[in-house]
Amino acid sequence: MQFNQFDPAAFLRDYWQKQPLLIRNPWRQWTNPLEPDGLAGLALEDGVESRLVVHGAAGLTLEHGPFGEDRFERLGETPWTLLVQAVDQHDPAVAALIEPFRFIPSWRIDDVMVSYASDGGGVGPHFDQYDVFLVQGAGRRRWQVGPLCGANSPLLPHADLRLLAEFEPSEEWILEAGDILYLPPGLAHNGVAIGDGCMTYSVGFRAPARSELIAGLGQPIGEDSQFAEHSVDVADVLPARYTWRRCSEG
């Protein structure tokens, strides 16, 4: 699975950790790597981290797997989202989805989380502390993005989910199969499935703090706040073979 129209160098220069980018189906040929039944099957297994977010009268509720087979049969018409972490460790086709993103150093790769949502399903407005490529595998999803958030951003009083108390979208897009939305760390976002059969692959890239990178050099240094920032720039290690062309934005 490879890109057909995408320039890694221009992306790293203009968008990486700076601003979101919508990439309309850049693949040579897009094929959804995993069927919904396969994802549901993983959510039944011990040792696989899975969650179920259900919309109800009282708001969003979160359940942790492994789940019984009858749990999905009892969901009915209520909007819901199933999320399974690190699917790349369990399915070779999903693991192959990482390969086109190897222009980013491998040590930054976190995992590929896969979600399946019914019509109206989502996990609510939130932000993450990592770079992520949201690959629409099947179906459609509306994504909205807002301002940058941080430790002081107000959150709703929810026991299980870190949901933003305030979310004013500044841009929105509808993604279809094969489309990709890149989001930098800290950017508020909200995704809602349009219709059933919505599958999204979240290819996440963490940025270790300097304190993590030098942890082996001694505890006192690692605890120094001046080394706790996330400041490693992937553009510094960009292979020379990439040229400076403009990204395909659709």
Model-based region annotation:
Residues 1-14, 28-179, 187-238, 244:
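Active-site region of the double-stranded beta-helix
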